[in-house]
Amino acid sequence: MPSSMSVRLFTASAAQRKKIQEGDCCVVLAGKTQGRFILIGAVARVSGYIPSYLDKDELCVVCGDKATGYHYRCITCEGCKGFFRRTIQKNLHPSYSCKYEGKCVIDKVTRNQCQECRFKKCKTVGMATDLVLDDSKRLAKRKLIEENREKRRKDEIQKSIVQRPEPTQEEWELIQVVTEAHVATNAQGSHWKQKRKFLPEDIGQAPIVNAPEGGKVDLEAFSQFTKIITPAITRVVDFAKKLPMFCELPCEDQIILLKGCCMEIMSLRAAVRYDPESETLTLNGEMAVTRGQLKNGGLGVVSDAIFDLGVSLSSFSLDDTEVALLQAVLLMSSDRPGLSSVERIEKCQEGFLLAFEHYINYRKHNIAHFWPKLLMKVTDLRMIGACHASRFLHMKVECPTELFPPLFLEVFED
């Protein structure tokens, strides 16, 4: 084997092996074993990215190898670019010396044999030392690049937000009707924190009646909750009756929709009044309860779902209109069993959803993917409604019927 040749092992990717096997590299193959190639001579070359401003076969002005771009004011290969950068950054050139009086010919074969002549040629062809950044400048440049990249990303997000449609005049009118219906039927309004009363700590801590699934029912807490359940249900009914599209439906469908959504809307109204400081929910705008009190007072595992929803929604900063539109979407659910006007109800819900989405665009929340995340809360509320229906059946077995308010039974009994 000629002394000028070298033998090395080269681990290649599938794409690189294909290139080698097809003779697309300047190598001589002596053999291969398990994807590792014994290369005699030059190392396998795999075509990399070449900028569009370079000719296909443009050569490095320093060594004559294939050029990869415009580096430090000259068209060079990656090898000469890296050599020049390292030399300047580490101040290596004072230690370079030539054995042949600085007269070496630099090409892609000899470029690694004499560092002094290679560096000398780099400067001769015009490579600029002042363009090589030291560590601090390089970090500053990298930071600037990252900042510009982040700015472009934010600009793209902002541009996409700006381009999203906002409510039409007709949708604004619908939004106003729904919002006014909610505000008129939402107990205590925005003053609920000032007007709420905390359920005494000793209530809801003494389970008396065993409930299924390991739950307990504190009858005193249950009695307190029954005092506010009737007005809470009444407010949900009043909300629905203030929507013209609901009132135009057959009475039978109105009843089915109300029975289906009542717990969901009451849960939503409680969840948006979650207070992180006291870790309580305020029911019907007046009674603040802890997770344990709500659980022991009859709701069992359903209370966990409502509290978890409250914790999640606290970061959304929903306004009255968004809460109102969520309620309208829950009310007009066309998949409730027994409905006769399915297509009509579905069309109403689609109208609410479209106006809702456009209102979200108008509000311009700073939460990524706000709209789909908010829609997931509709699914969570539907699950709460389904869990409560199951829980109600167990409660009817465990608790005396006279403890349940008549309207409560009317709404939640099948």
Swiss-Prot record:
InterPro entries: NHR-like_dom_sf, Nucl_hrmn_rcpt_lig-bd, Nuclear_hormone_rcpt_NR1, Nuclear_hrmn_rcpt, ThyrH_rcpt, Znf_hrmn_rcpt, Znf_NHR/GATA. Belongs to the nuclear hormone receptor family. NR1 subfamily. Composed of three domains: a modulating N-terminal domain, a DNA-binding domain and a C-terminal ligand-binding domain. High affinity receptor for triiodothyronine (T3). It is found in: Nucleus. A zinc finger (NR C4-type) spans 60-80, 98-122. Signal peptide: none annotated. GO terms for molecular function: nuclear receptor activity; RNA polymerase II cis-regulatory region sequence-specific DNA binding; zinc ion binding. GO terms for cellular component: nucleus; RNA polymerase II transcription regulator complex. Gene3D superfamilies: Erythroid Transcription Factor GATA-1, subunit A (3.30.50.10), Retinoid X Receptor (1.10.565.10). SUPFAM superfamilies: Glucocorticoid receptor-like (DNA-binding domain), Nuclear receptor ligand-binding domain. Induction: By thyroid hormone. Residues 170-414 form the NR LBD domain. One of its GO terms (biological process) is thyroid hormone receptor signaling pathway. The keyword Amino-acid biosynthesis does not apply. The gene is thrb-b. It comes from Xenopus laevis. Pfam families: Hormone_recep, zf-C4. This is Thyroid hormone receptor beta-B.
